[in-house]
């Protein structure tokens, strides 16, 4: 499995962050991740299609909001809190 690409903290752009948060589904993902330290994609999907959730997680990763790592066959997500402060 390919590792996920995450932009370095120095490359975070406010407009991308705000765009990522402008979608209600992505905002909900971020809010739920703020309540826990880490969660799998399945724990955050809310019954939505996997393809839609993959898109939303990619937008959040590209904006620098979320860190995703593979643990076996599960993708675990966490907020990049320190990079966003």
Where are these regions (language model features)?
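Generic intrinsically disordered, low-complexity segments enriched for polar/acidic and small residues
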Residues: 1, 16, 52-54
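Canonical helix-turn-helix DNA-binding module
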Residues: 42-68
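A detector for short, charged/polar N-terminal pre-domain segments
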Residues: 1-13
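Extended, hydrophobic interaction surfaces within ordered domains
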Residues: 66-67, 83-85
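N-terminal helix-turn-helix DNA-binding core of bacterial DNA-binding proteins
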Residues: 12-49, 71-83
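Short amphipathic alpha-helical surface micro-motifs
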Residues: 1, 57-61, 77-78
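Histidine (H) residue identity feature
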Residues: 6, 55-56, 75
């Amino acid at each position: 499995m390919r590792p996920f690409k995450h932009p370095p903290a120095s490359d975070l752009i406010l407009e991308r962050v705000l765009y990522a948060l402008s979608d209600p589904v992505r905002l909900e993902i971020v809010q739920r991740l703020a309540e826990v330290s880490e969660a799998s994609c399945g724990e955050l999907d809310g019954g939505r299609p996997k393809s839609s959730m993959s898109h939303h997680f990619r937008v959040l990763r590209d904006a620098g909001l979320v860190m995703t790592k593979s643990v076996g066959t599960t993708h675990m997500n966490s907020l990049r809190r320190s990079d966003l402060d």
